Each structure stands twice: as C-alpha cells, then as structure tokens.
Amino acid sequence: MASEITYAEVKFKNESNSLHTYSESPAAPREKPIRDLRKPGSPSLLLTSLMLLLLLLAITFLVAFIIYFQKYSQLLEEKKAAKNIMHNELNCTKSVSPMEDKVWSCCPKDWRLFGSHCYLVPTVSSSASWNKSEENCSRMGAHLVVIQSQEEQDFITGILDTHAAYFIGLWDTGHRQWQWVDQTPYEESITFWHNGEPSSGNEKCATIIYRWKTGWGWNDISCSLKQKSVCQMKKINL
C-alpha cells in the first residue's frame, strides 16, 4: 500500500521587513511653541517704549527751547529799552567805517571816546584806595583802565592833570606777578613804567603819574593810599 504524502504549504512572515517598514515610517512632527508677543520682553513692546521715550525727550527739548527763546527775547527787549532810556545821556559820534553795521559810537555823558572804549576821569573829590576805585568803576559798568598801546597811553595822559596820580587797572597778585583787572594778559613789551619801577614788593597797585624830567609813566604804590583813578568801558554802538 503506497504511503500517502501530505503536502502542507507553510508561509513565513518576514518579521524583519515588517519591523524595517515600521521603523521607516515618519515620526509625527513636534509642535513649535508659539511666543506670546504680549510678554514684557517682546521686541514690539520694547520698540513702543523706545518711541515713547524719544517723544517725551523731544517734547521736553521743545519746551526748554521755547522758555529759553522767550527769556532771550525778553533780555534783548530790556537791553534795547535801556539803550533808549540812556540815549538822552549819551554823546555819540557817527561812524565813518562802511564795514560797521552800527552807525553811532556812543559814550555816556562826561566820558571820552577813544578807539573801541570810553574813558572817565572822576571828579576831584573821588580820591579813594585802589579797591574802592575799582568798585566805583564797576558800579558804572566799567573797570579801572587797561592800557594796551602807546596811542592809548598818550590819549589818557592827554586828559589827566599833571599834578595828580591816577590808579590804573594793574595790580600785583604776588611775587611781582602783575595782572590786569579784565584778565588781559600782562606783557612786558607793552608797559610804561618809570625808570626803576616797579620798585617795592610791598607796593602792589599801579598808578600813572607825571614826573617833571621823564613825563608820564607808571609807578607802584600801596593799594591803601587814596588816589584819583581812570575808568574804562566798551563804547556803545547804536
């Protein structure tokens, strides 16, 4: 009896392929976090804050400028009014220079005009110490005279009394360091000292005085002595 042979079909599932196929499937993408633009550190909020700050600064600057302009305009008006009030007490000379935009060069009454300055020799009763003389000039908007040229020296001496001495705006600050009251640099080449002067370290104020043999020149004396003086101020242009 022939034996029966039974055939069975056996199929094997390829697990590796299945696993491989599973592994190659794309993973689900992660969701990116959305930034909240309303948070304090966001660029838009910083930009807004910066613009507000710049606006406030601009407003502040504008207000300050308006206030400054108003005060400056007021000062000009007051200065103009003061000149108008003083005009009746001024002695004026018409300018002949076409380069000057102002027509008149003026000095207060009793003052003398020379160059760009006005000069005043106070009255006989006005003798005072050097400090007091400077104070008297200052109250008139002037200072003790500062001499810067031979021409100026000659003009000043031409209006002085040869029998008196006059304080000028030169004083010794210490160790023979001479200084002008208006801070003009002191230059040895533009000085008019008498021979042998200055002569004493204790005499710290300068006068202009006439000597019979040598004429007008400068002399140092004690600041506390009472002398006449010469005041100087810038001319007024109208």
Swiss-Prot record:
**Tissue/organ expression:** Expressed in splenic antigen-presenting cells including B-cells, monocytes/macrophages, and dendritic cells (at protein level). Expressed in spleen and lymph node and slightly increased with dendritic cell maturation.
Record localization: Cell membrane
Q: Where does Ca(2+) 2 bind?
A: E197, S199, E203, N219, D220
Which positions bind alpha-D-mannopyranose?
E197, P198, S199, E203
Q: Which UniProt keywords apply?
A: Adaptive immunity, Calcium, Cell membrane, Disulfide bond, Glycoprotein, Immunity, Innate immunity, Lectin, Membrane, Metal-binding, Signal-anchor, Transmembrane, Transmembrane helix
The record's function comment reads: May be involved in regulating immune reactivity. May play a role in modulating dendritic cells (DC) differentiation and/or maturation. May be involved in the inhibition of B-cell-receptor-mediated calcium mobilization and protein tyrosine phosphorylation. C-type lectin receptor that binds carbohydrates mannose and fucose but also weakly interacts with N-acetylglucosamine (GlcNAc) in a Ca(2+)-dependent manner. Involved in regulating immune reactivity. Once triggered by antigen, it is internalized by clathrin-dependent endocytosis and delivers its antigenic cargo into the antigen presentation pathway resulting in cross-priming of CD8(+) T cells. This cross-presentation and cross-priming are enhanced by TLR7 and TLR8 agonists with increased expansion of the CD8(+) T cells, high production of IFNG and TNF with reduced levels of IL4, IL5 and IL13.
Q: What is this protein called?
A: C-type lectin domain family 4 member A
